[in-house]
Amino acid sequence: GSEMTQIEKVVDNYDGLGTIKVVKKDPVVYPNFSKTYTDEEIQSNDIIVVNETNGKSKLVSQSDMLVSEMDYQTMSQKVTTLDAEGQITAAIQSVTSANATTLYYTSGHSEQELDSTFKDVLNKSNIDTKELATESAESVPDDCNILLINGPQYDFTEAEYNVLSSYLKEGGKAMFFLYPTTTEKMTYFYKLLSDYGVNVADGYIIDSKGSYSSQYPMYLTPTMEDSDLTKDVTDTQKVVIPICKGMTVQSDVRSTLTVENMMSTTDSAYAKTNIKSQTVDKEDGDINGPFSVALSIKDSYAEKTKGTGHATEIVVFGSVSFETSTFLETNQFGNRTVLLNSLSYLAGQETTTLAIPTRSLQQESVQIQESDRIFFTVLLVVIIPLILLGSGLFIWIKRRKN
């Protein structure tokens, strides 16, 4: 089909780039060719990426490159996006990289499951994932390069806190996502952050001046601050965070600690402390902003005993909804860019790992913010017609006088 032609075009574009050479083999004519590189069954349009220098190889199957979704009108699977370039580039990076990065994600506290698109970003960034049941763990495994705490809805125990705190104190790297609407006391989880100069505000943020839609003031489009992790977000992109907790930086932090604001609300923001309230209007007990919604933390204390490069590094986002498929699967939003930069930072990657988004095979509509939609509606429906009417009236009156 047309998808197969598009895959072939993508593959042909790699031929001759640097030392890359494309060789096409018919699996019917050469049935045993693939056994040198993989034990898996090979089908037409599958791709094997081979590094002839170190012997590493990786299979990219046709099914990996064609992304399907359920068409509820026909109740059948329909190919919607092409992921050939992303999968092939990730495979090239995998077979040419010296070491893989291992990410451990905690479990046992109703953490958010890793979204399919988040998994895809990790896979394309050559980051392996493993589960860490902190309830039974005596320590964080030695091969953990990044610790992910992905929106827990229930708190950690004191014993779990001690395990995680020890890991961080020894120069660990971590990424935290908060669950904004939990009603549980998160004493030990939030203590992991307060140990590094960050306080978490109660409730979730309402910011009518910094929202994606005037109808949903809890859907934030935060301000990008001066940070290496947000600098690649373009002017045409928006980072969107639906329902988010606010954070503030403690005024007096130790000399080894640096806390950098990545994204923030406007001054008009406030935290809705009663998450069961039926109104988004400000009420008694709500907390005035502004707030940080994403922070990067670096503590150089561990470098005193373990040497350069062993600083504690944490990136924390105010909401687990930051990483959902809607905002990660295209470059239309800046969420993917910030997430990739954050992962690269924590992994200590000297060069940015490319995680190319999928290419839609369907026509995509242009997303316009609510405020822009209202502006253009007024401009086209009211202002321009009034200008034309006024101009016509002026010409008519002038001619009448003449």
Describe the function of each predicted region.
Residues 1-402:
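Short, surface-exposed patches at the edges or C-terminal ends of soluble domains, predominantly
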